Amino acid sequence: DDSETWKFVGNLPLTQFYKVAVNNAKPFYPIFGGPQDNGSAGGPSATDEIEGIANKHWYKTLFADGHQSATDPVYNNIVYAETQQGGLYRIDLTSGEKVSIQPQASDGEPHERFNWDAPILVSPHKPSRLYFASYRVWKSENRGDEWIPISGDLTRNENRIELPIMGRKQGWNNAWDVGAMSNYN
């Protein structure tokens, strides 16, 4: 009918997750992840409702471009989620508190260069221990309240905007490109 009428179908599982993580909550462990261009979200792996898993079962855990999520293997109310370029947050699902826990360079050090989708790992042996990476690997013993670097520079420290592509250097004024991915190799 030339697009005169539309129907909303609310049970199609349509989103693209970068990565997913699960926790140990019962009866149905939740799934957390960063859907592309859609913040970070959580939802059940199953439900006992006759309609199955629906949109109403999913909830936002973080804003912006969602990326990797991680869970605490002991405290099911603690989730970690991140935005692009290493914007790491610890989220308390009970209180709703969101705390930025991104590692920061010390005075006199160069700024931290994070990957578009920076890796995070929660230790399965000591859940308060986190590992996170910028151009170097960081470790926290207190769920991200404090960080120490445990490696040197693991990159080539090349600014990709300044590298020639097909014989031509790009510029910072390429709006389609700046911030669309990692800026450094």
Question: What kind of feature is each model-predicted range?
Answer:
Residues 1-185:
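Beta-propeller blade termini and top-face loops
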